[in-house]
Each structure stands twice: as C-alpha cells, then as structure tokens.
Amino acid sequence: MGFIIGFLLSVFGYLLGSILFAKIVASYKGIDITSVGSKSAGATNVTRTLGKKYGALVFLLDAFKGFLIAILDRFYIDPSSLWFGIVMVSPVIGHIYSYRSDFKGGKGVATAFGVVFGISPLLALKMFLVWAFVFYLFRYVSLASITSVLVGYFLFLEGDFSTSQKLGATMIAFLILYKHKDNVFRLLRKEEHKFK
C-alpha cells in the first residue's frame, strides 16, 4: 500500500510541477516567456518581462505546487520512508523538466521554497530572509537564490529531519544549483545582470 501511495503521489507531484504558470500567465499577455529574456519559465523572467505584479503571482503559484505536495507527503507518507524524499523532489523535477514544454521549465526555486514551507515554515522563513538580505546587498536574483538554497540545505541537514527528508533536500539543492550553473559562471565573470 505504501508503494502505491508513494508512487501515485510522486507521479502527481511531477504532473503538478510540470504546470508552468510562467507560460500560462505570460500567454495571457501574448508573450511566449520561453523565447524572451533568460527564456526560463520562472518567476524571475516573468518579473523582468512583465513586471513585479505578474512575477509575484507566478512565484506564489509555483510555490503552491511544492507546498501542496509537501502537505500531501506529510499526511500520507511516513517521514522515514524513502518515498517521502522522492515525493518531495517530484514537483521540483516537474517544474524544471516539464513534459508540457519539451522537458524544459524554470529553475525550481519557488517550487522548492513551497516544499520547504510545507515541511518546515520556520526553515522557509529563514531561507526567505537570507534571500532578501543577499538580494538587498547585491541585487543579483541568482546569487540570492543560490545562497538561500545552500543555507537552507545545510540548516536542513542539521535539523531534526529524517534521512529520507534529507536525501530529498539534497536532490532538490543539487537540481537547483545545477540549473544555476550558467549564472555562477556569469557571476564569476561579472557578466550577470543586476535586478534594477
């Protein structure tokens, strides 16, 4: 029974994560978000292209995907089960590798934030504060996101979480950092665009 529930929640998480709200919101404005700006189907590109109001909407919708799956995960899956970690990762994988968009999508930050918020609101708050502080100092969204994810990840490892939850957090952190590799190189070359 545990296998069936874990499998079904993982599939549902991936399918839900694959709904790219950035594309949906931008399409209402007649824009293909994957062909403008960074071409990423995420909140940052929407903010740069359509403005803060639309960017905030996309962030909240993307975060809700992760939050909902995390709540279902906590309700149906034992935290010690390997399935807990798998379900945790599923909406982030769906968002980054959406089957609805040729297995391309966003970078997973908002969806991952939703997952963390669903598991530990306090940890999510700490991640947000780190993000806001770094962004305020340097005005780089990518640097703020990377720093927030790294700090959140190490806090997760030090926290009172199961091995499965920590494995899930490890996979999520790896995916997000991997998707930001080009940003890291641009930051090192001082070519990354600051957010005005």
Swiss-Prot record:
<keyword id="KW-0472">Membrane</keyword>
<keyword id="KW-0997">Cell inner membrane</keyword>
<comment type="pathway">
    <text>Lipid metabolism; phospholipid metabolism.</text>
</comment>
<comment type="similarity">
    <text>Belongs to the PlsY family.</text>
</comment>
<keyword id="KW-0808">Transferase</keyword>
<keyword id="KW-1003">Cell membrane</keyword>
<keyword id="KW-0444">Lipid biosynthesis</keyword>
<dbReference type="Pfam" id="PF02660">
    <property type="entry name" value="G3P_acyltransf"/>
</dbReference>
<feature type="transmembrane region" description="Helical">
    <location>
        <begin position="53"/>
        <end position="73"/>
    </location>
</feature>
<feature type="transmembrane region" description="Helical">
    <location>
        <begin position="76"/>
        <end position="96"/>
    </location>
</feature>
<protein>
    <recommendedName>
        <fullName>Glycerol-3-phosphate acyltransferase</fullName>
        <ecNumber>2.3.1.275</ecNumber>
    </recommendedName>
</protein>
<feature type="transmembrane region" description="Helical">
    <location>
        <begin position="141"/>
        <end position="161"/>
    </location>
</feature>
<keyword id="KW-1133">Transmembrane helix</keyword>
<keyword id="KW-0812">Transmembrane</keyword>
<feature type="transmembrane region" description="Helical">
    <location>
        <begin position="1"/>
        <end position="21"/>
    </location>
</feature>
<dbReference type="GO" id="GO:0043772">
    <property type="term" value="F:acyl-phosphate glycerol-3-phosphate acyltransferase activity"/>
</dbReference>
<dbReference type="GO" id="GO:0008654">
    <property type="term" value="P:phospholipid biosynthetic process"/>
</dbReference>
<dbReference type="InterPro" id="IPR003811">
    <property type="entry name" value="G3P_acylTferase_PlsY"/>
</dbReference>
<keyword id="KW-0443">Lipid metabolism</keyword>
<keyword id="KW-1208">Phospholipid metabolism</keyword>
<comment type="function">
    <text>Catalyzes the transfer of an acyl group from acyl-phosphate (acyl-PO(4)) to glycerol-3-phosphate (G3P) to form lysophosphatidic acid (LPA). This enzyme utilizes acyl-phosphate as fatty acyl donor, but not acyl-CoA or acyl-ACP.</text>
</comment>
<comment type="subunit">
    <text>Probably interacts with PlsX.</text>
</comment>
<dbReference type="GO" id="GO:0005886">
    <property type="term" value="C:plasma membrane"/>
</dbReference>
<feature type="transmembrane region" description="Helical">
    <location>
        <begin position="115"/>
        <end position="135"/>
    </location>
</feature>
<keyword id="KW-0594">Phospholipid biosynthesis</keyword>
